[in-house]
Curated annotation (Swiss-Prot):
One of the GO biological process terms: proteolysis
PANTHER family (UniProt xref): ATP-DEPENDENT CLP PROTEASE ADAPTER PROTEIN CLPS (PTHR33473:SF19), ATP-DEPENDENT CLP PROTEASE ADAPTER PROTEIN CLPS1, CHLOROPLASTIC (PTHR33473)
Pfam family of the protein (one): ClpS
Listed name of the protein: ATP-dependent Clp protease adapter protein ClpS
Subunit organization: Binds to the N-terminal domain of the chaperone ClpA.
Organism name: Rhodospirillum centenum (strain ATCC 51521 / SW)
Function: Involved in the modulation of the specificity of the ClpAP-mediated ATP-dependent protein degradation.
Protein's gene: clpS
Biased composition (Basic and acidic residues): 1-10
Family indicated by similarity: Belongs to the ClpS family.
Length: 108
């Protein structure tokens, strides 16, 4: 046998081409927070939670009571765009009904 055959250094090389998968970063998440006030009726807050956050009556009532007792509560966690939209929707809806209800967002 020739030396080149022993070492396998000569001739065409074969290999596998591996495509690098791009690393996709998960989007940052934001909490939509509802703030307590002394003027917005509890039933209105429950309605907002059901309408804009798809909460059932029991869960909406639980969140409303948490906001009432602690001053602030989480309505949900969303991507920035969704959280921002929900805050705007809630604030606009509250103003239309002449309630001072406040919502804000905070990075999770």
């Amino acid at each position: 046998m020739a030396d080149s055959d022993k070492h396998g250094d000569e001739g065409p090389s074969t290999g596998v081409v591996v495509k690098a998968k791009p690393k996709t970063k998960k989007p940052s998440m934001y909490k939509v927070l509802m703030l307590n006030d002394d003027y917005t009726p509890m039933e209105f807050v429950v309605h907002v939670l059901e309408r804009f956050f798809n909460k059932n009556r029991e869960e909406a009532t639980r969140i409303m009571l948490h906001v009432h007792r602690r001053g602030v509560g989480v309505c949900g966690v969303f991507t920035y765009e969704v959280a921002e939209t929900k805050v705007t929707q809630v604030m606009d809806f509250a103003r239309q009904h002449q309630h001072p209800l406040q919502c804000t967002l905070e990075k999770d």
